[in-house]
A protein has these predicted regions:
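Conserved active-site tyrosine of GNAT-family acetyltransferases
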Residues: 44, 137, 142
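Conserved catalytic-core motifs of GNAT/GCN5-like acyltransferases
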Residues: 125-127, 143-159
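Conserved GNAT acetyl-CoA-binding A-motif
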Residues: 116-130
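Acidic/histidine-enriched, beta-strand-rich ligand/metal-binding domains
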Residues: 91, 99-100, 123, 136
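Conserved acetyl-CoA-binding loop-helix of GNAT-fold acetyltransferases
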Residues: 101-114, 139
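Acetyl-CoA-dependent GNAT
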Residues: 3, 8, 12, 16, ...
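Conserved short alpha-helix immediately C-terminal to the canonical SAM/SAH-binding motif I
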Residues: 108, 132-133
Length: 164
């Protein structure tokens, strides 16, 4: 719903479904989705990649992943991320409970780091929560760049970096 402030400025109220009226009085529908389609997400990635290329001249990010599978082909551990512009980013690192403390997480991270070096990256960044063993990354040379407290409630989140 739109209104005006005492100064005559447009004010917008955010709802899960709303209409946005611009200064040109063009009406646009906006809906919050909790399960967007893969094609919609890929559309956004393609548009941001185009924008990034136009702004930086750098090609699209290249994905990096490694997996540990059991004899049945089920994933028991994996790492996923990408490299772009001389930096690699770990998006996901997970090891099943039954395979933890066996060095698999370290092996996956080392493989990711080696691939980042091969791609001539100078640093690796990642984000983690207090309950996701940030000390695991600290032991491997990652340092915190900053912390967001109470995310999630009662916990904290940090972004970490390692120069390679």
């Amino acid at each position: 719903m739109m209104g005006q402030s005492d100064a005559g400025e447009d004010i917008y109220e955010i709802e899960t479904s709303l209409k946005i009226e611009t200064a040109l009085k063009i009406e646009t529908e906006l809906e919050i989705e909790t399960a967007p389609s893969a094609s919609d997400v890929e559309f956004l990635y393609a548009r941001i990649t185009e924008s990034n290329l136009a702004a930086t001249g750098l090609p699209a990010a290249e994905r990096i992943s490694a997996w540990v599978r059991n004899d049945s082909g089920e994933i028991e551990a994996g790492i996923y991320g990408w490299s772009w512009g001389g930096t690699a980013e770990v998006d996901l690192l997970w090891v099943s409970e039954s395979r933890r403390s066996a060095g698999i997480g370290s092996a996956l991270l080392t493989a990711f780091e080696s691939e980042a070096i091969a791609r001539r990256c100078s640093q690796i960044v990642l984000s983690t929560f207090d309950f996701q063993a940030p000390e695991f990354y600290e032991r491997r040379g990652y340092t915190s760049l900053g912390r967001v407290d109470d995310y999630p409630a009662g916990g904290w989140h940090t972004t970490m970096r390692k120069l390679i």
